Amino acid sequence: MSKLNAYFGEYGGQFVPQILVPALDQLEHEFIKAQADESFKQEFKELLQEYAGRPTALTKTRNIVKNTKTKLYLKREDLLHGGAHKTNQVLGQALLAKRMGKKEIIAETGAGQHGVATALACALLDLKCRVYMGAKDVERQSPNVFRMKLMGAEVIPVHSGSATLKDACNEALRDWSANYNKAHYLLGTAAGPHPFPTIVREFQRMIGEETKQQILAKEGKLPDAVIACVGGGSNAIGMFADFIDETSVQLIGVEPAGKGIETGEHGAPLKHGKTGIFFGMKAPLMQNSDGQIEESYSISAGLDFPSVGPQHAHLLAIGRAEYASATDNEALDAFKLLCKKEGIIPALESSHALAYALKLAYENPDKEQLLVVNLSGRGDKDIFTVHDILKEKGEM
């Protein structure tokens, strides 16, 4: 059986303890078999349609870019069951786990969206579920913690390190090392050791496939650019995958600039990091001069990650995609605008992509351009965070 390529240019690979290599080999083997199995593909497709609610809408905005010549569409992953794009690939991986005879699922989560998606898939497919979550994130994402528990998941707060996503990732890998015979590690983004970046991309690529069909039906042409936020990079690679060969379409990823790149408090390793080994892969990393992992920071827990998926690093290196950044304040402004102008409450993660799209529209009001933003999730989970910030600013 042919194997998948473990690298994207110089990025990717499989830097894990020897004990995990058989588990990763088994995962790759089963994934390749599943991709050629019509019954697996049919079951996945049915779950996406009947349970998750695909295809999701492509919504043309009415008011937010009204005084410009930009046409702005939103790919509505916020309407997916579970509230974000995460549900897509989680259903795929959970089906794979069942196929491998695994009865338990281990996951990590930042904003809690991946945890919620994993919990709902495990409830549906009768799998035992435990989710590692940084203690800080447990505090700032209490609604999602409760959702996970309601669906039968065990949520394990991680107090080590910065008590955020990277520490939850480390604990999840530790657990998997001890239990890989009976448990599948359901990784939440298009990063980590091979074959995860490829598996997650393939289980998210319907985002871009649907977008392409929908925009051609609505506008009769491809967009000038597709724009998505980038933390680990799964919603972005899901949007980009089907457009990579369409060279007329700009691929724009938006990293979190946090309090400003110059402050060091950000999560933008693609443009402002150095290549290193982290989380089982070779990828751009936020690290200090000693090579220690630096703390990443973002207003949105889901983008608060010090590295990024290897395919994004490769797309940047070969010049196929470009990567910008948006600050906390820019994301907040975009969040508020979408609420007030379109009646849609976006996730703070997705608000970073929206902020950059609005910048393109407002800075060139006379430029005719067709833009699509991947609205990767809804903002219910963020309303308390936003409320507290606006109250502090005297805007409430």
From Swiss-Prot:
Q: Name one Pfam family in it.
A: PALP
Q: What's the superkingdom here?
A: Bacteria
Determine if Amino-acid biosynthesis is one of this entry's keywords. Answer: yes
Q: In which pathway does it act?
A: Amino-acid biosynthesis; L-tryptophan biosynthesis; L-tryptophan from chorismate: step 5/5
Query: Which of the residues bear the PTM N6-(pyridoxal phosphate)lysine?
Result: K86
Which keywords does the record carry? Amino-acid biosynthesis, Aromatic amino acid biosynthesis, Lyase, Pyridoxal phosphate, Tryptophan biosynthesis
Q: Does the keyword Amino-acid biosynthesis apply?
A: yes
Instruction: Name any cofactors this protein relies on.
Output: pyridoxal 5'-phosphate
Give the PANTHER family listed for this entry. TRYPTOPHAN SYNTHASE, TRYPTOPHAN SYNTHASE-RELATED
NCBIfam families for the chain: trpB (TIGR00263)
Family membership noted in the UniProt record: Belongs to the TrpB family.
What protein is this chain from?
A: Tryptophan synthase beta chain
Output the lineage of the source organism.
Bacteria, Pseudomonadati, Pseudomonadota, Gammaproteobacteria, Thiotrichales
Q: Which gene encodes it?
A: trpB
